[in-house]
Amino acid sequence: MRKFEMSTKASTMRATVIKLHLFVAAFFAPILLMVALSGGLYLIGSKGTTERVALAVPETIVFDEGATDLKAEVSDLLRQLGQPTDFEYLKTSGKTLITRPTSRTGFEITRNEAGLSVTEVRPDWIKTIVELHKGHGPTLFKNFQKVMAVGLLFIVISGLWLGLTAKGLRQNTLLTSAAGAIIFLLLALS
């Protein structure tokens, strides 16, 4: 009787893990497909493009790139130019300030010998998903990506566990996992 109880508990746990595995995989399928698509496109050289539009900046506009609250200074500049100010944060690249996220239309602000230049940068759909993949999207999306990473770990670990604990799948699971690990190591270390 005790063996039957253990078997029933084990099969109930297995059924629960299978359901969780399937639900988590289904829930994260859209973002995992986006990551696979954007990563694949990026690796074959299709990184997307941006349309860049130089904005007219009147000489009367004052902009202090040394301001204590640079985000407020950039927001004020964009407001004076009649542009949206809904960026989340700034990235500095050399002498250029870049509004983030870069997964949507943003701006680059540069001071050079000719004065202040502001460029509107509009990504196409490929550039948008590549930027999301790289973690350059909105903060809420980046937090979702962190949760998705945990979900992906669960999907892989639960899939391995399900394969290793099923007598009929154990050998194939071990062989396939070993082959994947060997190929990964050979390619990564080559």
Please identify what each model-predicted range represents.
Residues 2-49, 140-190:
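Internal alpha-helical transmembrane segments
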Residues 12, 73-76, 124, 128:
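Exposed alpha-helical structural elements
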Residues 17-24, 77-80, 112:
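A broad, low-specificity signal for short, low-complexity segments enriched in glycine/proline
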Residues 27-35, 82-90, 113-119:
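Short, mixed-charge, low-aromatic patches
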Residues 35, 39-91:
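Membrane-proximal low-complexity regions enriched in glycine and acidic/polar residues
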Residues 85-109:
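Exposed beta-strand-loop-beta-strand "reactive/processing" segments of non-cytosolic proteins
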Residues 102-149:
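Extended, hydrophilic extramembrane loops/domains of integral membrane proteins
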